[in-house]
């Protein structure tokens, strides 16, 4: 094994899979160099079943080439683009923190309201990053016409040190693309779409301004701007529905903040803010008039207050990755292995009864999976389960059924493991 807990993936060591979506897997990884140089990064790797689809691979590569041209403190940095065996990947900046779709609910559960002034501070940084991307030019001064098209709470990340990053310019549209997205194709999260996006029209940067307005509206009022029983109902609401002033839901919304939101949310884009810089200027003007303006330090302290347990678990995971020289793993290429454990602190597998425990006895006299002891800390802490899989068809099938039965968080990874082994066994 080339390094602790993971597999060599070119010049990188994969440490843990931290997310998976329809398009790609995201791995926490380490880049190593001369004289002990190390850098923690993220690897975004196309999922195996998509690597053979030529059109998708081309879209992925075009996305990476576009995103790699963005270099701004408010945008996640792309470091590398490559292919190892049949796996295409992007190496990108690792940001220890949480996205806003997790921060606000976590604060609410802790009984700590998320201050509106913090929401405005974050939105100002989003505006700055968007304006940079929207006005980005190539080496010859030609505009790239970048539009993010998916500004949502999930794509706005705040690090533990209080810095804000826009993530996933993955469905950005630019003239640099080899093939333009079909005109009527709708992408992005429905509830934050601009009216022109919902109608499948050609987009420009003002669509992102509307989406940010929808996000900020939700943070300020506590209500999602567009809702509906199904996708068509949401789209109809975006196109035809009335947008109520924020004070309709929350009486104490300052008049200046309400003006900012209503201008950003103009359905006619000609009446909207014409640049993200204009929106940022109005937000910053309001913040300057307040008795208190939050800094990155204030945001950092707020996050540490509500995420203290998760921050410690992530530190422990990184330290453990350094200590452990060998880990049970799955094959990834020639003699490359990856441990089956996710960063979020959930077990890969529990016992057949649903309670964490001994994994040796799955089904009475049925197939057995050899295991090392499982250690359990206090409720909600990281549950470690290390498995050594016996390479027999019955045992693998039993493990597959167990993962399916309990709908475990890393089930996609378990499925891929089992499919790979079953294919190998013939």
Regions found by a protein language model. Name each.
Residues 1-244:
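Conserved ATP-binding/catalytic core of the eukaryotic-like protein kinase fold
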Residues 103, 174, 237, 286, ...:
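Residues that scaffold the ATP/ADP-binding catalytic core of kinase and kinase-like folds
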Residues 408-426:
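Short, basic amphipathic alpha-helical segments that act as recognition/interaction helices
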Residues 1-16, 36, 110, 286, ...:
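Short N-terminal regulatory/linker segments that flank and modulate the kinase catalytic core
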Residues 364-391, 400-403:
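Short Lys/Arg-rich basic patches
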Residues 130, 134, 283, 421-425:
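Hydrophobic recognition helices of helix-based DNA-binding modules
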Residues 393-412:
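Surface-exposed, Lys/Arg-rich phosphate-binding patches that contact polyanionic backbones
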Residues 154-157, 167, 191-342, 349:
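C-terminal lobe helix-coil module of Hanks-type protein kinase domains
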